[in-house]
């Protein structure tokens, strides 16, 4: 296996006290020319993912007007399209916010891994294991967005260790659809894996 260690910057909620709001006064520093990208799964939960994604974008745009940052949507028509959009448009944003469950966190990690751009997580999936492991808000959209805004304004994040796997030379895979040996025909792996120990 060919792999290397990398760090993922995850926007934390250290700036947020759920009961009282921000722990310290927010910086009045302008974040002009700062852009936050949002990616969600529009087909999840029979379209409810798109509704929540739209709500997150609205909340971030409201905060952006107050704190001086812009918000763009990089969501595609599928997981692969969204990942391609987030990667292709990476020079257009400074932060990426993934809205969804562990699958969308994986998409976000694969989009910004090694870029140094922080990943915000609005955990609204069925499991949300990654967010739970970091003590991020789960199924609390407004609280998650408020914490993300605090992390943007204060410049805080958590470093999460990951491995970038680029190949599995000794690996062997079977295509379950027709039993064809695909170990030689597939493209090399280029995925980030993060986890809690």
Task: Please place each PLM-identified region on the residue numbering.
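ATP/NTP phosphate-donor binding region
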Residues: 7-99, 106, 110, 142, ...
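Short, flexible micro-motifs
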Residues: 50, 103-106, 128-130, 138
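Catalytic core of DAGKc-family lipid kinases
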Residues: 37, 61-65, 74-76, 81, ...
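Short glycine-rich anion-binding loops that position phosphate/pyrophosphate groups of nucleotides
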Residues: 43-45, 101-104, 124-127, 197
């Amino acid at each position: 296996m060919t792999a290397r260690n990398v760090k993922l910057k995850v926007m934390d909620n250290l700036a947020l006290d759920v009961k009282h709001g921000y722990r310290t006064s927010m910086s009045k520093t302008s974040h002009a020319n700062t852009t936050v990208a949002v990616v969600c799964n529009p087909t999840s939960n029979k379209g409810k993912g798109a509704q929540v994604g739209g709500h997150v974008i609205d909340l971030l745009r409201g905060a952006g007007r107050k704190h001086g940052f812009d918000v763009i949507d990089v969501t595609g028509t599928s997981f692969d399209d969204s990942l391609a959009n987030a990667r292709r448009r990476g020079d257009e944003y400074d932060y990426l916010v993934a809205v969804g469950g562990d699958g969308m966190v994986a998409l976000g990690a694969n989009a910004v891994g090694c870029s140094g751009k922080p990943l915000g997580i609005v955990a609204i999936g069925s499991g949300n294991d990654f967010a739970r492991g970091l003590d991020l808000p789960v199924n609390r959209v407004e609280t998650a967005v408020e914490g993300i805004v605090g992390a943007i304004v204060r410049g805080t994040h958590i470093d999460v260790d990951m491995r970038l796997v680029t190949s599995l030379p000794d690996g062997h895979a079977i295509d379950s659809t027709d039993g064809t040996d695909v170990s030689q025909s597939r493209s090399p792996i280029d995925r980030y894996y993060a986890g809690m120990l």
